[in-house]
């Protein structure tokens, strides 16, 4: 397999050596972006953290059908799917767990008090996304609970032209997908809508699914000083869950989930002050059956709510930029297994960005204070440091504490294979990172070393294969890692090309973890290499190829190659995709085998 990797990389670089750059045209495509997943708006090139950006143009060029597909092309992002089309998937960053990663949509936090298994249920469709901001490393100081190892903020489109599209897609395993997108804009505001349905017979016994997705966003701009943005979304999923949970032998499991979001937010400026208030409500519903045809044997019902309000304020002064904010919310759950429970929480943030020597050096110390009605109060400080070595090179580092309180599943869940633990303590970690970034349009490159010294990590462990999985605060675990990524758009003749390479290495020191079997924490990627290449063959024909190599300490490594061809003619686009080109045999989690080579064909019409 290593020879395939070597050959693939050599081929990619051989293309790039033929490049004839047109810097002016490419720089128009790579204009500066202000990163919004922080309390203080900072240009991407001036940020002192490891942040990846995926633009709408990159998403379109990759032919990614879902956000899950796009994230799997980023080194350090471990998406563990059960099945296809992202129907059930968990998100891990830099060796953390799915409960340690926070998802946001336009800055709205979507943490789930029941379990992080449902985080990706809220993902919006590709068609409404402006960009994806991936914050690697601890972000709890900035974003609060659950951003233990990182966060992903999906920024949806705010400015667009009137129009729309319809798309039909079909392929292997009886996959059928239909969607409608509509956009309208005027001087008083704009509105976009997405409706889609995706279904399949399944790639093996009891892996069929039916998914429905609705996403609505409107902007009201009659008052230029107080523009209002409204988001409403709903995702419903019904799927066979052969071996997804419990054990690989549980072949007749079934699950239905719902994810709903409503949010209202605005942004206003008064002098050097900027205010960003928002209110939000999220709802999750989960219905699980151990035997699909016989619900009486065992079933779980869970309904969660989170309602809150937040305010981010920034002040620009002679001393730099100050960011302050708060988030007040109430979460609740009604469950036949976990019980009826609720908690109130208040989070307060404070940070200040100092700059020295004409912005050559910047320091951003900050602290987050949390007040929980059931877990007490906590304060976690941290600092980011950046040194601009030249107009292209930037050295950065950060040091800080991060945390996560247990989910209701961690605390109270009980079934024939798993036991919760009401005596669990919050997870804590001290994080260190040192990175170097090169940013010279069109080439972007960064490398980083990071270390996480975690205490009281929550994992499900057991002493023997016959024992029950029990939620436990395992002892300290030190994770060290190295990461690099390169993004290089260029031209061959007048045809646009885009090359992306990434690699992450992780090492967990488990010398103080005296457990024989671990469900989550001791199965991170050890080696993770990603590569993608997009080439414009003609003015209307484009070809994308993506490669992922992954190796976990307890499993054999595997290589997955996906490819697609996009042909545009008039107002139509025809896309043919082939996934798992090598027909690799592998699993991403829970010993659930992933599908072999499969194809999809889609036709889209723009109007």
Describe the role of every protein-language-model region.
Residues 68, 72-108:
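Extracytoplasmic beta-strand/coil segments of soluble accessory domains associated
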Residues 246-269, 394, 401-455, 462-491, ...:
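Outer-membrane beta-barrel signature, preferentially recognizing the C-terminal barrel domain
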Residues 29-60, 90:
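N-terminal periplasmic "start-of-domain" segments of outer-membrane beta-barrel proteins
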Residues 318-319, 323, 356-357, 451-453, ...:
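Gram-negative outer-membrane beta-barrel transporters
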Residues 200-207, 211, 221, 225-306:
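Flexible loop and strand-edge segments within Gram-negative outer membrane beta-barrel domains
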Residues 108-136, 155-157:
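Short acidic/polar hinge/loop motifs at secondary-structure boundaries
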